[in-house]
Amino acid sequence: NKELLTAAGYTQDDIKGFDDLKKVADDIQARKAELGVDGAFTSAGMDGSSDWRFKTHLANLPIYYEYKADGIGSTDAIKGTYLDNYKKIWDLYITDSTCDPKLLASKTGNDAVAEFVGKKAVFYQNGTWAYNDVKDLGDDNLGMLPIYIGVNGEENQGLCTGSENFWCVNYNSSDADIQATLDFLYWCVTSEAGTSAMADKMGFVIPFKKAKDSTNPLIAIANDYVAEGKTS
């Protein structure tokens, strides 16, 4: 939330790595009553609607840096070199938070969204696909930062980028239903109506030649990082 970050006396340009992030978050947490927030970060809920943000998406960072440093491409080769970095960012999330860490087991993804949209937290970890959840803040108030974990060179890091690899079609269905489903999926990613719905109403990136560009401003921010030469 750029509005809250500015009210605290900072801009995104002040945050170029983990140490900067911690300094800013610690200060916001210490002044939360003055700033009218409940914490620097939204609650890092560990129920099924939220824990994937940290057990998979956040965990990708230390794994990526180990793959890069050791030239590996298999999870069997992971030694846990950057586990301390993983712990550092996680500890920051739950210490400079809107809630006591003891409550995280029951906190949900909707809780985090409500805290962010309700201007009770400055930072919220999620991706471009969550735009519809947070758009009520106003596009001008939405910014995106890389997830910093305290690794050398992370000032040149962009946003984490990933995608789902496939859609599933139930092969136990009738041949007619399978074909109808495949036809529908093709329509979704090639037709004007289908790509408009996915780009404008859902805010998705659609990586197909005939697809419409998304109007999601978070995707534009992600593209800006790439244009600046940041690793994404």
Q: Which residues does each predicted region cover?
A:
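Short helix-initiation/N-cap motifs at beta->coil->alpha
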Residues: 16-22, 103-118
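Paired acidic/hydrophobic, glycine-rich loop segments that form the ligand-binding mouth/hinge
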Residues: 122-127, 143
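Extracytoplasmic/periplasmic solute-binding protein
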Residues: 22-75, 121
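Glycine-centered hinge/linker elements that transmit conformational signals in sensory
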Residues: 24-27, 71-106
